Amino acid sequence: MMARFIFLSFFMLVGALAPTKAQNSFPYPALPDSLRSVEQRAAYLSEHYWDNFNFSDTQELANKEMAEQGFVNFIDILARFDQEIAQKGITAFTAKAYQQKPSKEKFESLIEHYYENPESPMRNDRVYALFLEDMAKSPYFDETEKERIGFKLKQARKNLP
């Protein structure tokens, strides 16, 4: 009887902890089965990558496994897409990420960290310039910020062909 109680308690504990573990990983979008070509799947993933992420949840923003690792994976795949698909993904991302100040600050700092650091393995001036172009057009940045962004964009473009 005691063994049965311990066994059931163990499974109840595992069941209670399982949702917590699942919430600590980035909520990737599911690709529709109707998308057959690589280009269609890439475009969908680029534009819908952030659909399940709650930008207003400060706990998700502070969670490195969700916000930072999700962002790192996002910029990694953007570098593999052509410019048009990458730009659509960045536009979809910034439309959501910059609406709230905490998420704007978080992701702006991650963009700087991964793209401005010359030692960063994620550094990619082509993708960085796409982020900066989108930020320069965004209504969520004031004129002073846009001036700084314009300078960074000019510097990033120097390394492009």
What are these regions (language model features)?
Residues 1-25:
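Bacterial Sec-dependent N-terminal signal peptides
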Residues 23-161:
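Oxidative protein folding and maturation machinery
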